[in-house]
Regions:
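Acidic, metal-coordinating helix/loop segments flanking the phosphotransfer/catalytic sites
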Residues: 50-68
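Alpha4 helix (beta4-alpha4-beta5 surface) of REC/receiver domains from two-component response regulators
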Residues: 37, 81-82, 94, 105-123, ...
């Protein structure tokens, strides 16, 4: 006896695990990047890379291809604005959001929506829940395969 099984009764295909958004932290403090990496990875939401040598930041970003970059604004002997500009001028990275991290502002200035050199910023010290909220505010929409999705604007006439 042959049985016909309708498609409605078959289990849904198991969706492959989506790639987590890639976050790159650029800060000269190894202790800071390590603790942030650990905290973010414990949320289970992100894959996190660290770069503690600002001179290698652009090269690391090219290799990692992050979905978002957290960049310390006050690193010795480094102009973080130049680091951000190099990343933004790279055709493979120009759409990657850069969020500055700084101890030079207050949390109320962050809440006011001010920007530094056209970039959003988060105040240090920062808790992991605050950091996750800041990342989620600035993380672009990701496609099903885990890469940045291009957004299309549709208007109704």
């Amino acid at each position: 006896m042959n049985r016909i099984i309708e498609a409605n009764f078959l289990p849904a295909p198991v969706e492959e695990a989506k790639e987590k958004p890639r976050i790159l932290i650029i800060d000269n403090s190894r202790d800071f990047t390590y603790s942030v990496k650990l905290g973010l990875e414990r949320t289970g939401r992100y894959s996190v890379w660290e770069e503690n040598e600002p001179a290698r930041a652009h090269q690391t970003a090219q290799r990692v291809k992050p979905d978002l970059i957290l960049l310390d604004i006050a690193m010795p002997e480094t102009d973080s604005g130049e680091v951000a500009a190099r990343i933004e001028s790279d055709p493979t990275l120009h759409r990657t959001p850069v969020v500055f991290l700084t101890a030079l502002v207050t949390k109320s200035e962050v809440r006011s929506g001010l920007q530094i050199q056209g970039h959003p910023f988060l105040a240090k010290p920062i808790s992991i829940p605050e950091l996750v909220a800041g990342i989620e505010r600035n993380l672009p929409a990701l496609s099903h395969d885990g890469h940045i999705a291009s957004l299309q604007h549709v208007t109704n006439n």
